[in-house]
Amino acid sequence: MSSGGLLLLLGLLTLWEVLTPVSSKDRPKKPGLCPPRPQKPCVKECKNDWSCPGQQKCCNYGCIDECRDPIFVN
């Protein structure tokens, strides 16, 4: 790959990283709470609720970010 192509790719990746959080910042969080922390190694499966399918939420458990079905508490 030429240096110009590599520079373009790097620029596009940087732009994508900067714009991704902004696009979901104005959206409200999905309803419900995250279930208890799973016992598994660190994984980064999602960045926010809107990167998860359906009603699932992006739940943060320290070094684990994963899509989980929400729990609802009355």
UniProtKB/Swiss-Prot annotation:
Residues 27-71 form the WAP domain. InterPro entries: Elafin-like_sf, WAP_dom, WAP_four-disulfide_core. It is found in: Secreted. Gene3D superfamilies: Elafin-like. GO terms for biological process: antibacterial humoral response; innate immune response; venom-mediated disruption of cell wall in another organism. GO terms for cellular component: extracellular region; extracellular space. Disulfide bonds join 34-59, 42-63, 46-58, 52-67. GO terms for molecular function: serine-type endopeptidase inhibitor activity. Keywords: Antibiotic, Antimicrobial, Disulfide bond, Secreted, Signal. Expressed by the venom gland. It holds the Pfam family WAP. The keyword Nucleotidyltransferase does not apply. Residues 1-24 form the signal peptide. It comes from the Eukaryota. The keyword Secreted applies. SUPFAM superfamilies: Elafin-like (SSF57256). Belongs to the venom waprin family. Damages membranes of susceptible bacteria. Has antibacterial activity against the Gram-positive bacteria B.megaterium and S.warneri. After 45 minutes of treatment with this protein, B.megaterium have no visible pili and are smooth. Has no antibacterial activity against the Gram-positive bacteria B.thuringiensis, S.aureus, S.clavuligerus and B. anthracis, or the Gram-negative bacteria E.coli and A.tumefaciens. Has no hemolytic activity. Does not inhibit the proteinases elastase and cathepsin G. Is not toxic to mice. This is Omwaprin-b.
